[in-house]
Amino acid sequence: MFPKIFLTAATALLSAKSTFAQTYSSCNPLFTTGCPANTALGKSIDVDFTSGSVNSFDGSGDITYDSNGASFTVAKSGDAPTLSSIFYIMFGKVQITMKAAPGAGIVSTLVLQSDDLDEIDMEWLGADDTEVQTNYFGKGKVTDYNRGAFNPAANNQGEFITYTIEWTSEQVVWSVGSTVVRVLTPATADTDQYPQSPMQIKFGAWSGGDSSNAAGTISWARGPTDYSNGPFTMVVQSIDVSDYSTGTQYKYGDQSGDWTSIEAIGGSVNGNVPASASSIQTAGAAAVTSSSPTIPAGINNGNSATRTGYPWVAGTQTVSEVTWSTGPSIPSGWEISSEGKIVPVSASPINISRINPLLLCGPFTFFFFAAIRRWP
């Protein structure tokens, strides 16, 4: 029989999982007042998927775990295995170590996206293992999809490579290994398009080349996808996330979408920015791939879709109608550990210096001094 304290903890954990599954809402702060605050990470975590799953990332689709890490498999039409953080960051750094999925039309994706549809992306097309596409959007405005750029990432399907997105109020820096491949600043971004609101993190694989997609999407993904050549698997070894702000929640102060309007409840925006992040990178922004649309506007713009259509979900909403799920929250009394696990908040350690030393000397000594009412 388990001790009662273990049973209580188990019950609480089950309740926590139930909370994760039920507390979803969709609200775009640009169009709606009173949107719920976003759960803040407020710290740094290092998640090792070779040790299994963690409950700070909510999974959907076919995801398995082994000594290589988390595997995201696309085997048939409609498959889009995804892990989504239950937390948000307000500026920060995301480092993912992974192998991209092979296959024409197959897309491996890392997305940072906010409730008001700011977005920072890295996407690997399975038809070419030598490059990665970097992209960004602001407030859900796709204009003519003219911001994507392809950057070198040799042998990205054959070996584990660490990719980094570092995002501050002054710049977004994309890196492959230790090499900076692209830099974006507010000055070089399209007007009012610099990403600057709290971001949720999603990553996984999907089929941009699926026959049900629009012709523009299939062409961009270098499809079509031939599922008989599959299954197609993306493998993620680890993900490290550092939130450059502090607090428990991030809240939109108005409908501007400007970072200066974001409130960090119980902390401060930019309260955890390392000195290294303050230096402006000198690498030039990579050239865009095209000035014409490669994915028609309005395609795959469902409640959970990014501007490039990930995760793959059929939808017909226009960009202005799109909302974004705020994701699950962390139950009261629980926190995210440095390994990315949801755990009970630890009890405060006992401060030995505040304990009267007589309590450590045995009952006779204690009661002797208590009787004469004189304490050392």
From Swiss-Prot:
InterPro entries membership: ConA-like_dom_sf (IPR013320), GH16 (IPR000757), Glyco_hydro_16_CRH1_prd (IPR017168), Glycosyl_Hydrlase_16 (IPR050546)
Annotated PROSITE patterns: GH16_2, PROKAR_LIPOPROTEIN
Domain GH16: start-end pairs: 22-229
Gene Ontology CC terms: fungal-type cell wall; incipient cellular bud site; side of membrane
Keywords from the UniProt entry: Cell membrane, Cell wall biogenesis/degradation, Disulfide bond, Glycoprotein, Glycosidase, Glycosyltransferase, GPI-anchor, Hydrolase, Lipoprotein, Membrane, Signal, Transferase
GO terms (BP aspect): carbohydrate metabolic process; chitin metabolic process; fungal-type cell wall organization
Record Gene3D superfamilies: 2.60.120.200
Top-level taxonomic group: Eukaryota
Signal peptide feature range: 1-21
Pro-sequence residue ranges: 347-376
Active site: E119, E123
Name this polypeptide is given: Crh-like protein 4
